[in-house]
Amino acid sequence: MSHLAELVANAAAAINQASDVAALDNVRVEYLGKKGHLTLQMMTLRDLPPEERPAAGAVINAAKEQVQQALNARKAELESAALNARLAAETIDISLPGRRIENGGLHPVTRTIDRIESFFGELGFTVATGPEIEDDYHNFDALNIPGHHPARADHDTFWFDATRLLRTQTSGVQIRTMKAQQPPIRIIAPGRVYRNDYDQTHTPMFHQMEGLIVDTNISFTNLKGTLHDFLRNFFEEDLQIRFRPSYFPFTEPSAEVDVMGKNGKWLEVLGCGMVHPNVLRNVGIDPEIYSGFAFGMGMERLTMLRYGVTDLRSFFENDLRFLKQFK
């Protein structure tokens, strides 16, 4: 007990001399640890008469508290000094130019889809969607393509079983729409479709958009006028356009639509036709009262023609050098 004041003074001196937190912790252990000087002072209480022990214990505890407060204060000083030193070493030169955040951009196929949806939206078309895993009825039968029809062989279909498949066209959306609502109908149906083919101009998955109008007094003239306006708007040119007779099981008459390319050659861009009466009957619409036209086009093909892309596979390879050109 006689050395208590001296111990506190020595502890204070050691605390002030500690140059970092590690050295300060050594001082704490020396004086307040399990075998520290002040801790050992508590053991001397057993040598005192019982009536003196409470007062003596209070004095020792006060000394320990004094040392602990000094330790806390010094630790705060050392940590603050260390932080200031680190901040000084990490000073940021605010005069340097900042790092520019590079803006992203839409994929070229997405840009094409958005552009087409915007055009037809102004004509009163609404966007309709449907399942990508389709059944045999909606993908083929309802579209006037029964099981024995040779057109099925042209689709290179991915089958799950005898009746389930990955849709080969978005025409199933038209069937579902016509079964769900009565005319007038005016929709476009964008979406992914699947065919078992892969080369420079074909991929197993690609994007298609189909359009459909069903109403009274719809004629081939309406179809031609709509597609003329669309193609000239899409390519932003007064294009030379021709309609070639063709065959699709779900339209009659049917046509392929070509545009004149910059090289003086005709380029096929889409297929179209008047909705076949059998298709209307299959969905419960009377072909004696209503008529309609439909058209379908590949989004990748239109994107290739619009931007001069020569390899369809470029759209799916995620090459930033390619994609950045469309920002």
Curated annotation (Swiss-Prot):
Sequence positions that bind Mg(2+): 252
Main subcellular location: cytoplasm
One Gene Ontology term of the molecular function aspect: tRNA binding
Top EC class for this record: ligase
Gene3D superfamilies reported in the protein's UniProt record: Bira Bifunctional Protein, Domain 2
GO cellular component: cytoplasm
Keywords: Aminoacyl-tRNA synthetase, ATP-binding, Cytoplasm, Ligase, Magnesium, Metal-binding, Nucleotide-binding, Protein biosynthesis
Places the protein is found: Cytoplasm
Reactions listed under catalytic activity: tRNA(Phe) + L-phenylalanine + ATP = L-phenylalanyl-tRNA(Phe) + AMP + diphosphate + H(+)
Required co-factors: Mg(2+)
Enzyme Commission number(s) from the entry: 6.1.1.20
One Gene Ontology term from the biological process aspect of the record: phenylalanyl-tRNA aminoacylation
Note accompanying the cofactor annotation: Binds 2 magnesium ions per tetramer.
Subunit annotation: Tetramer of two alpha and two beta subunits.
Family: Belongs to the class-II aminoacyl-tRNA synthetase family. Phe-tRNA synthetase alpha subunit type 1 subfamily.
Name assigned to this protein: Phenylalanine--tRNA ligase alpha subunit
Organism for this UniProt entry: Salmonella choleraesuis (strain SC-B67)
